[in-house]
Regions:
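A short linear hydrophobic-aromatic micro-motif
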Residues: 2, 25-28, 63-67, 134-139
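ATP-dependent carboxylate activation and anion-phosphoryl transfer catalytic cores
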Residues: 98-99, 113-181
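Generic hydrophobic alpha-helical segments
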Residues: 14-18, 53-54, 122, 175
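A conserved helix-loop-beta module that forms one wall/lid of the active-site cleft
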Residues: 1-39
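Phosphate-binding site of ATP-dependent enzymes
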Residues: 22, 35-126, 130, 141, ...
Length: 181
């Protein structure tokens, strides 16, 4: 997903940056956060209504600005990798009338089988990390058959381990294999 990164305490004209890219409906979220914390979606002309919250977020962390993709309404895919090896996937869906997929906003999740093409596209996102993470959750949506990365979660992501019987063992082996011998 095209993304504008705004660093902590940086002054940026979000409206001008978004307009230059042709975005009319945007999502603004912290670079570090979880559970939809301080995530806002709004039409660009409503930016003044959210500017105070965005400034508060920028006081102690950066933000990501992305175009709102209506594909999220059909669900966000989470593909889990342990030491670079695909393990399993979940589909997170928002409740009717919302865009947030987190359970605290009424979102649900379910096991899902994904094709090798999506696994390969999600795996390609991991190779851009500075080092291969022991675990990663690759979140995104599918548009026209293409996986669009929304977030690469590598710090304590929800991994849906209880929903896949083999996943806890895969995760444990990946961690064990990284420990000094």
């Amino acid at each position: 997903v095209p993304t504008i990164c705004i660093a902590r305490q940086e002054k940026a004209d979000i409206a001008a940056l978004a307009r230059a890219r042709g975005w009319n409906d945007i999502v603004v979220k912290p670079t570090i956060g979880g559970g939809g914390y301080r995530t806002y979606r709004f039409p660009l002309d409503e930016l003044p209504r959210y500017s105070g919250e965005i400034e508060q977020t920028l006081a102690d962390r950066g933000v990501l600005v992305q175009p709102f993709l209506p594909e999220i309404l059909n669900g966000e895919l989470s593909l889990l990798f342990f030491d670079g090896v695909y393990s399993h996937a979940a589909l997170k869906r928002p409740k009717a009338g919302d865009y947030r997929v987190q359970f605290q906003y009424g979102g649900t999740n379910e096991n899902v089988e994904v094709g090798e093409d999506l696994v390969a596209q999600a795996r390609a996102c991991i190779v851009h990390a500075p080092a291969l993470p022991v675990y990663a959750r690759v979140d995104g949506v599918v548009k026209d058959g293409k996986f669009l990365l929304m977030e690469l979660e590598v710090f304590e992501p929800l991994m849906f381990l209880s929903r896949h019987p083999e996943a806890p063992g895969r995760f444990a082996r990946a961690v064990r294999d990284r420990l000094p011998k």
